[in-house]
C-alpha cells in the first residue's frame, strides 16, 4: 500500500459508470481496474495508469479562480462513459490530494508515485488539478529519463519568477523545472504551444528567450500550415529521447473550454491541437502525459470536462 503517503487516496470505483450497450467491453468503464498496492505494480504486465492530482492550491497562490481540485474525478467520470476503440486495459490508481495548502508535500508524493510506476515499466496518464501538476510530474520522471524534453500546450509560458526555497504556484512550474535543470547541470528542453500574446507579459517573453524556450503562438497555429507546425515539432524533438507532454485546457478557446481559471477568448479550437498531439504520441517519444486546469465549478454544461475526456480518449487510442 502507499500508506506512507499521507495525501494519497485510493481510487473510487463509483466514478466509473456508463451505458451497457452490448456484452462486449466497449467503453472505458468496462476496461478499468483498481490498484492501491505497490506489489501489484511490480509485474511484467505493463499498464497505462490514471493518476489524479487534486489540487488548486497553486491556482489560489497565483490569484486565480479555484475549483480545479475537483478536476481529476470529473475527468474520470466523463472518460468512463466513452467508447474505447482499442484492446488495452487501464488502471485507476486514485488521486494525490492537496489539503491545507500542503502543495509541496503533495507534489513530492505525486512525484514518488510517478517515479515508482515508471521504474516498473508503466506509463502515467495524469489528471489535474492546477498546472502545478507539471512540477510534480517532472520530478517523478527526471532521474529516469536523462534526455527528457517538456512540451506544454498552453496559453501561458508558466515561467513566472521563482527562486529556490520560495513557494511555487500554477504559474511557476516551468521556472521550477528550469531552476532544477540548472542545479543539476542538465539542459532545459521546453517547448510551449499556443502561447497568447496578451496572456503573458513582455518580461515573460524575455524570460522565455533567455531560457531558449521554443514556442508557437496561438496566432502561429491559425496562420501556419500543419506541415509547418509539424516541422517545428520535429526540430524540437530531434535530439530528445523522451517527452513529457502536458496539456493546459486554457490553450483552448472559451467557447470550448469555459471551465478553467483563465479562459481564452482568442484560444484555439480542439482540431487545431489534436493533429499535433497525435503526431507527438505517434513519435513514440512521449513517456508520460497529463491534462490540467479543469475546474468543474466554473464549467458550463460539462463542456470542458467532456472535452478533456475526449482529448485523453483520442490520445490513448493513438498508436
Curated annotation (Swiss-Prot):
Keywords: Histidine metabolism, Hydrolase, Manganese, Metal-binding. GO terms for molecular function: agmatinase activity; formimidoylglutamase activity; manganese ion binding. Transmembrane segments: none annotated. It comes from the Bacteria. SUPFAM superfamilies: Arginase/deacetylase. It catalyses: N-formimidoyl-L-glutamate + H2O = formamide + L-glutamate. Pathway: Amino-acid degradation; L-histidine degradation into L-glutamate; L-glutamate from N-formimidoyl-L-glutamate (hydrolase route): step 1/1. InterPro entries: HutG (IPR005923), Ureohydrolase (IPR006035), Ureohydrolase_dom_sf (IPR023696). Pfam families: Arginase (PF00491). Its cofactor is Mn(2+). Mn(2+) 1 binds at residues 131, 154, 158, 248. GO terms for biological process: L-histidine catabolic process to glutamate and formamide; L-histidine catabolic process to glutamate and formate; putrescine biosynthetic process from arginine, via agmatine. Belongs to the arginase family. Catalyzes the conversion of N-formimidoyl-L-glutamate to L-glutamate and formamide. This is Formimidoylglutamase. The gene is hutG.
